[in-house]
Swiss-Prot record:
It is found in: Nucleus; Chromosome. GO terms for cellular component: nucleosome; nucleus. It comes from the Eukaryota. This is Putative histone H2B type 2-D. The modification N6-butyryllysine is found at residues 6, 21. The modification N-acetylproline is found at residue 2. There is a cross-link at residues 6, 21 (Glycyl lysine isopeptide (Lys-Gly) (interchain with G-Cter in SUMO2)). SMART domains: H2B.
Length: 164
């Protein structure tokens, strides 16, 4: 008498487990590997800013790769600055400078809602602004050629080079 063929039981109607699991040839179930992405966060921000607007899958992929690239740049610059200053940890205060270095020149001039604001009478910390011998750049050079820039003062948009 022939043996009955071993098949996986058919998924019940409305069951979502069949969608999330892939089948091997020997009948054992295997979970798909999870991919991390920023798509849910991009979607939440989009709905908060423009509630009636949607986003295509390809556009979400572009936004995801953009955010990965920005975070890689910021992390690389932060670790480089921590190494230069002989620090083993990166604090939240020290993370603003790499953001200013990696982002376009207009981004650091936009204040963050949670960023601590410094009054004009308070002296600037020595590590965030260049010394008195800092040279200004000629206006013909693009900002990326000369190096990083930071906002001067309390987010007034006046940019000065970090290079001495």
């Amino acid at each position: 008498m022939p043996e009955p063929a071993k098949f996986a039981p058919a998924p019940k109607k409305g069951s979502k487990k069949a969608v999330t699991k892939a089948q091997k040839k020997d009948g054992k179930k295997r979970k798909r590997s999870r991919k991390e992405s920023y798509s849910i966060y991009v979607y939440k921000v989009l709905k908060r800013v423009h509630p009636d607007t949607g986003i295509w899958c390809k556009a979400m992929g572009i936004m995801n790769s953009f955010l990965n690239d920005i975070f890689e740049r910021i992390a690389g610059e932060a670790s480089r600055l921590a190494h230069y200053n002989k620090r083993s940890t990166i604090t939240s205060r020290r993370s603003r400078r790499p953001c200013a270095c990696c982002c376009p020149a207009s981004w650091p001039s936009t204040p963050c809602p949670r960023a601590p604001r410094r009054s004009p009478s308070t002296p600037a910390p020595s590590e965030s602004l260049p010394g008195p011998g800092a040279r200004s750049l000629p206006p013909s050079l693009p900002p990326r050629v000369a190096g990083c820039f930071v906002s001067k003062g309390s987010f007034q948009g006046h940019l000065t080079p970090l290079v001495k």
